[in-house]
């Protein structure tokens, strides 16, 4: 099994000043900045973790004459996290979310691109669940009470790299000069489950592209989806029952090609999948003890235990308003993307590309928050699927409605205390006044409590009164014969 030794969510902000290429005209107005984060490396060393990657962005702007142009910008990402529990032998689980990407003009030839990245990093170390099965003492016979422990623990933490490729055909036209104005990729998980002891991760890479057609000033936007399906082994002693997965993009290659029958987009994506599989562990452990010849001081340990189960999918929606003169604008593209996720909610960014009467293109954005209702239990986001936004023009602006399907796991923690050792307080029998044979009226009281009270043992009481586990009478006796256990 594994135990989580590190869990931290940090936000990293990075920026870069980019110069408009010499082949392009001066910048008059910024339109939109699209981009994607690619994870290049994740490594652990003693008490630290290093995350390296890059945000590949496209800055779309308008020249003085209104013509749209774009150029690529790269924002390097280097994040260092420190933690006393980190070491080279831990295994990672990382979720990256591009929370914000923006650009502003410094002058007509320079822009400053700023990005905010949310990183949720967890580390797991292989370990054993130390349970107390018996207690021994030099002070005499120690009687123990055991209870069954049933918990869900990480039993496998795996990582796998893979590639997804597909050829897409442009349906709305042909890109001018065989290049895109901008593009952005999002990895969506459709289903994550356990089948035949292995983790099944199914999803798609959604690519949103914008391009100009020959002789047109208004951009065309299309969305292409490249599916993927991966099987990850779960080498573990316990049968896995639930899996939490994260899939990160490590590289994206897009190529536009034209032919007599139309234009196509060749998409090749390199990805890494990380999974944490939970399995059910059952064991008997000591929860109480006493000695018939001495007073004992018990040593306790709290086990961070709990169970986990997948909840029913949540269908959430949030509404908002972009204040503007909607009657004077035409929406030419709209989409919603996840820009933040936590255990209690997620953020969705709704982005509209609009044109006015003079065919000037601009971008309108609105961030909407959706709250999860977990019913008091601790929820863990498995994945979230944003749907296409609904946009309605009103007298006050554009009314937005964003819907998201959220799959969650519910964690029910339980503080389980076990006895790990005993210390003899005094070597005199604390039960000297207890008679050697006692008859008590039984009202269903716990046998372990009776055994401690009358210096007996639970097993002895069961044997004396015919209450063996394999031969329980239909009618329980009203009285119990409790013999005092000899040392």
Label every PLM stretch briefly.
Residues 426-463, 468-487:
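Primarily a LysM-type cell-wall glycan-binding module
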Residues 1-433:
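Membrane-lipid interaction segments
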């Amino acid at each position: 099994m594994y135990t989580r030794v590190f869990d931290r969510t940090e936000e990293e902000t990075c920026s870069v000043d980019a110069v408009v290429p010499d082949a392009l005209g001066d910048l008059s107005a910024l339109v939109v900045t699209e981009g994607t984060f690619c994870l290049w490396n994740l490594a652990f060393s003693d008490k630290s973790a290093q995350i390296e990657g890059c945000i590949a962005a496209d800055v779309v702007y308008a020249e003085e004459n209104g013509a749209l142009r774009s150029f690529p910008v790269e924002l390097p990402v280097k994040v260092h996290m420190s933690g006393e529990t980190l070491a080279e032998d831990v295994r990672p689980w990382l979720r990256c979310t591009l929370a914000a990407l923006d650009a502003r003009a410094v002058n007509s030839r320079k822009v400053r691109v700023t990005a905010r990245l949310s990183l949720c990093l967890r580390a797991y170390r292989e370990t054993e669940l130390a349970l107390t099965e018996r207690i021994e003492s030099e002070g005499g016979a120690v009687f123990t009470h055991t209870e069954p422990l049933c918990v869900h623990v990480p039993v496998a933490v795996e990582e796998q790299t893979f590639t997804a490729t597909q050829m897409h055909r442009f349906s709305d036209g042909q890109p001018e000069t065989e290049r895109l104005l901008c593009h952005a990729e999002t990895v969506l998980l459709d289903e994550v489950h356990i089948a035949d002891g292995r983790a099944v991760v199914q999803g798609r890479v959604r690519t949103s592209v914008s391009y100009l057609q020959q002789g047109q000033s208004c951009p065309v936007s299309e969305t292409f989806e490249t599916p993927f399906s991966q099987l990850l082994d779960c080498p573990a002693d316990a049968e896995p029952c639930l899996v939490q997965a994260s899939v990160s993009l490590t590289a994206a290659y897009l190529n536009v090609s034209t032919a007599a029958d139309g234009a196509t987009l060749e998409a090749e994506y390199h990805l890494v999948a990380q999974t944490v599989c939970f399995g059910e562990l059952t064991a008997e452990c000591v929860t109480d003890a006493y000695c018939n010849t001495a007073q004992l001081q018990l040593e306790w340990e709290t086990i961070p235990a709990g169970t986990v189960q997948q909840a029913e999918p949540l269908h959430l929606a949030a509404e908002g308003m972009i204040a503007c003169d909607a009657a004077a604008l035409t929406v030419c593209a709209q989409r919603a993307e996840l820009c933040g996720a936590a255990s209690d909610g997620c953020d969705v960014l709704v982005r509209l590309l609009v044109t006015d009467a003079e065919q000037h293109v601009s971008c309108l954005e609105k961030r909407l928050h959706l709250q999860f209702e977990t019913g008091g239990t601790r929820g863990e986001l498995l994945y979230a699927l944003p749907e296409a936004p609904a946009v309605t023009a009103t007298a006050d602006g554009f009314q937005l409605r964003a819907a998201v399907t959220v799959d969650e796991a519910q964690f029910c923690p339980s503080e389980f205390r076990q006895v790990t050792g005993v210390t003899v307080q005094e070597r005199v029998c604390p039960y000297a006044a207890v008679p050697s044979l006692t008859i008590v009226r039984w009202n269903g009281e716990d046998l372990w409590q009776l055994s401690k009270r009358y210096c007996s043992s639970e097993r002895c009481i069961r044997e004396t009164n015919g209450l063996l586990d394999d031969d329980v009478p239909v009618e329980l006796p009203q009285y119990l014969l409790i013999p005092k256990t000899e040392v």
